[in-house]
Each structure stands twice: as C-alpha cells, then as structure tokens.
Amino acid sequence: MKKTILQEASIKYREEALANLKKFVAINTVMDLKSASESSPFGTGVRQGLDFVADLGRKLGFNVDYCSHYVTELSLGTGPVIDVYCHADVVPVSKNWKTDPFKVTIDSNNKMYGRGVSDDKGPGMASLYGIKMLSDLGYINGYKVRMIFGGNEENGSAGLEAYFHKLKKGYPSYGISPDGDYPLIYAEKGIFTYKASYDLFIPGLTNFHFGQATNIVLDEVKLKLNGVTDLEAKVAKFDMENADIRVFLAEGEIVFKGKAAHGSIPWEGVNAGLYALKFMSEVLNIPVLENIFNDYNDGRGTAFDGNYPSKYFDGASYNIGKISYEDGKLTLVCNMRLPENVGPEEACTNIANKTKAKIELIGGSPALINDPKSAFIQELLKAYVEQTGDTESKPLAIGGGTYARDSKNSVAFGCTFPGRDPKMHQDDEVFSLEDFYASIYIVAAAVDKLGKLAIRESK
C-alpha cells in the first residue's frame, strides 16, 4: 500500500510525540480524593496531568481552557465542532508489574509498557499530534476541533459531566473517543454500579477491605484469620484444589493471587476477593459465602439468570471490584454492564430476588447505540480503511465504556488494533510504537473527514 499524505507527514511528529508521552506517563494520575480540593477536584496527581496537557497544548499553538480543572480543553479553528475525547487519569497499579508503571519502558520488540500507554495517555498524545499535524497542513479550515482531556473517566466521567452541564459547553457536531478499538465501536453496554449487602457473622474477623476500583478484577487480596486450627494445611489444600488461584501464607496473612482484567470482561481474570470468600466458606462453614462465589465467579450472572443477550450484545457482565466486611455486614460493590434490552432497576430487582442480598443501585449510564449505516459511521470507516488498507475488520459492540456515551453523535475510534491485547487495567499495560505512530495519522484522517462532513451538513 502506497503511503498516504498523512502517513508521510506524520513521520516528523513521532519523536516529539513519544518524548511527551514519556513525560505524561511519568505523572501518577490515579484519582486521589484525599488530596482533592476546589482547584484539584480529582486530586493533585490528576491536576498535574491536566496542567501538563494544557502547557503542551499551548506550546503547540492550541487555545487552552482549564475548565475549572475538571478537564483540559485544547481547541483550533472555527465552525462546526468536532470533539476528540481522551482522559488523563489512569487506574491504580499493583505491585506485580515487571517494569516501573510510571515510566515508559520500550522492549526489543518496540512495545511500550507503562500505566496509561494504551488507556488513555498514548492514544491521547497520538491524537494531539495528529490534530497538530492537520493544523500545520492547513486542513482545519471551516471547522473547529476541541480536544478534551478528562480527569475522571476511570471513576465515573464526572469531568465530562461538568464540562457539558456545569460549564455549559455545547455538544459537538460529531465526536470520537480514541479510548477503544479500531475500526470503531458503534455500541457500548450500559454501565452501572450497585452494592450488595449481607448481614452475617464471620468468626475470627473484625473487618477487611478489598479493592480500589470497581472496573478492575481484584487480582490480589490479603486476609488475616484468627482462631483457625491447622490453617497452614487448610491453605495448602485450598491452593491445590483451586488451580486458577495461588493461595499461600506470608507474614501471618493468607495471600490470594488471581489475575487482573478489565471490569467489562471479568471472565478473563481471576477474582482473588471471591476466592477469599470461598476459602472462608469452607474453613468457617459459612454457606452464604460459597453462594456469593457461585453467583459472581463466572462474571456473566448465569447463576441468577442475569445475562440478557440482545441484538447487539452477547449478554451482561458483573465484576465485583470491592469487598468489605465491617460490623457484621459484608458488602460487595459490583460494576454491572447491561445490554440495551434491560434496565438497571429490573436487573437489580432480579439480583435481589435470586441472591437474597440487599441491593442498592448507586448510578450509571445507559447503553449507547449508533446506526452503523449512518454517514457519521461510514466516514470514520473510510478514514480507517484509507489509512490502513484493512477492509476486513468490522465495527464493534462492546462491554467497555468510553466518553462517547457522555456526549452526542460520538463513538469510540481506536486506538487498539484488531488482534492486539493492550492489557488495559492490568499489570504491564502495553502499546506498540508502531500502533502509537499509526494512530497519529489515523485519528487525524478521522477528524478531518468528520470536519468536512459537518461543513457539508451545515450548508
């Protein structure tokens, strides 16, 4: 395939884009409400990340709006608006990384490792330089591009909600979020959070708290149980009988080591917290804990008839991201992803009836469905095909959620190529240099096609 104009033009931006990605990843932008304030609503780390983007955007010639530090807006041009939604925040890291998660490490295969390289600092940086390239080439003519780096995508999209509703920013003609897969994602499941509570007594325990985020499979938990006879033998037996999980004693605590995965696909991980409940059910003879394990371990809601396959999706998902026990109450916090054919209230009523837990729906957002035959989607597909030559890959419907659901006329577009595993929300998150560089010109092509479409439609 002969190189396109944008492919050729993008080469000179590669070195600078990579250098600034390294600086961006070096900032720990995990949300920290302990350090939050009016000027840093998501904590000082996220604020530093948003300020870094603002300073870089200004140097590159963008107009900058700090947006009360909920998001950073970088804009160029005038006319119908095309939005590009990225996020500066990242999910927490474990101690099991093979490299420093806050340093970009590039291996011999030109793969980059670091928290945020694929979700979403790498795609964000590629998009930023793609838009800069469009400006330098004179392509941004008759339309406006707003690049929006959010500060709270991983914990509920409060940043973008403030952008549109508190700050009263207008919706775009079209928008893309490079926080998913190529060629594009036209449908996303509804994403909701609920608490499931159980009144029960666990002997030998006063309290415990597992997990930091609901959209990550719990990959490691530690538990201190008092008064259990032959504990070492019981731990060894449980470890031998449960091949998916590693269980051992260390410094007086029982360690459960599972496997992290994105909360939208919990079946690809191993939930250490659920296995801790199963262990307690066996050694302490508490059947309800075994029931909880069976209810949630497959991640699909099969045990309580909660799968709901639909026209667009293969079914629901349920990820238990937090588990706590205090004052005789066990509480699970579940990240629930639902197809368009069922509402959260109906799903929660079903769970309450089938599991006998007290269910409290906390909130969320409904499914997003775009018409794959619309001019909007077709223009994006043209951009992808023209820049990659890939005519085989089809638009996707997924369980993951992006900023696209918080806007209008928006979809996730890139930057994970078909067949790649970016290990989002897992240890050793990865993004290849080749894909990073390619996304500079692919996102640029998409933005320009949408800009021209918006101009045509405005006349």
What is the predicted role of each segment?
Residues 24, 28, 225, 276:
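Residue-level signal for inorganic ion chemistry
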Residues 72-74, 223, 251-259, 331-334, ...:
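A generic structural motif
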Residues 94-107, 191-192, 196-200, 246-258, ...:
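Acidic-glycine-rich active-site phosphate/pyrophosphate-binding loop
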Residues 2-115, 136-141:
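Acidic/His- and Gly-rich active-site-bordering loop/insert found
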Residues 81-149, 154-155, 169-170, 426-427, ...:
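Active-site metal-coordination/substrate-binding segment of hydrolases
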Residues 65, 264-327, 333, 337-346, ...:
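An extended, acidic, His-containing surface patch that forms the Zn2+-binding/catalytic region
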Residues 120-201, 301-312, 458:
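Acidic/histidine-rich catalytic neighborhood of metal-dependent amide-processing enzymes
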Residues 204-205, 229-235, 341-348:
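Short, conserved charged micro-motifs
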